């Protein structure tokens, strides 16, 4: 069971169907929650049209069970979720509030986990700007306090060195959009929202750890160090190039 909060036009189910053909043969249930019934309805129409068009490529596919839920975060759903996703939603809720982000992140962590079962996983993605980066860092801290394991992007479970405090560095990632469909670029241009780069901050945490996290070998002469690159190339003295990175 999946739960997509702030689903809009079924953004996550559509993205998963397109990007992960191996999931098309699995009988999955998606609870898609949003305050706009029109967006949910429109998204389901898009999803069904895509399903019809991909049949030749994956004839073994089965139609996923899409359950539309109109409401805000906190609205009850019938089943506990194995996987909770939330993309580009929280910033709409905390952006203009006077409450401290520390308090907000704790409250939303409790709300998120109230939807999940004992083995749930959570993926939250926000725009790659300082305030959102700070929120993601605080959300990460709250998830750790709830005994969740951070699977990505962090290679460690200690304090974030780029915690997004005012005037400081914040953890975010930037991708080029040159491989996006030409029609999408054209649509963005016509809306005067042209983008050649997409920037985002995210955290992926889970209660299911043993099967997905490789445990370090104790007393190893060559201990493995995980490194996560977190910046574009930067110029260094003597015509060298480097990148910022986090390590375990």
Predicted ranges, named:
Residues 42-78:
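S-adenosyl-L-methionine
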Residues 173-174, 181-248:
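C-terminal lobe and adjacent flexible extensions of AdoMet/dcAdoMet transferase-like proteins
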Residues 135-155:
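Conserved Class I S-adenosyl-L-methionine
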Residues 9-25:
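Conserved SAM-binding loop of SAM-dependent methyltransferases across substrates and taxa
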Residues 2-8:
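Conserved class I S-adenosyl-L-methionine
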Residues 36:
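Conserved SAM/SAH-binding beta-strand->alpha-helix loop
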Residues 118-126:
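Conserved beta-strand signature within the Rossmann-like core of class I S-adenosyl-L-methionine
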């Amino acid at each position: 069971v999946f739960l997509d909060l702030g689903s809009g036009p079924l953004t996550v189910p559509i993205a998963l169907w397109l990007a992960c053909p191996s999931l098309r043969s699995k009988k999955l249930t998606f609870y898609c929650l949003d305050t706009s019934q029109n967006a949910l309805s429109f998204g389901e129409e898009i999803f069904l049209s895509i399903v019809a068009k991909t049949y030749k490529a994956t004839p073994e596919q089965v139609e996923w069970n899409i359950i539309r839920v109109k409401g805000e975060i906190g609205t009850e759903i019938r089943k506990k979720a194995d996987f909770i996703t939330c993309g580009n939603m929280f910033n709409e809720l905390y952006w203009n509030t006077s409450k401290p982000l520390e308090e907000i992140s704790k409250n939303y962590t409790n709300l998120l986990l109230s939807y999940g079962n004992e083995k749930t996983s959570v993926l939250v993605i926000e725009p790659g700007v300082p305030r959102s980066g700070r929120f993601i860092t605080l959300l990460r801290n709250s998830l750790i306090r709830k005994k969740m394991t951070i699977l990505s992007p962090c290679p460690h479970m200690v304090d974030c060195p780029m915690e997004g405090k005012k005037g400081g560095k914040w953890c975010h990632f930037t991708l080029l959009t040159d491989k996006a469909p030409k029609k999408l670029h054209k649509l963005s241009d016509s809306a005067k929202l042209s983008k050649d780069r997409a920037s985002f901050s995210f955290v992926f945490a889970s209660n299911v750890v043993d099967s997905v996290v490789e445990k370090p070998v104790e007393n190893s002469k060559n201990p493995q160090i995980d490194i996560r690159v977190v910046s574009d190339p930067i110029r260094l003295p003597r015509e060298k190039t480097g990148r910022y990175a986090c390590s375990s």
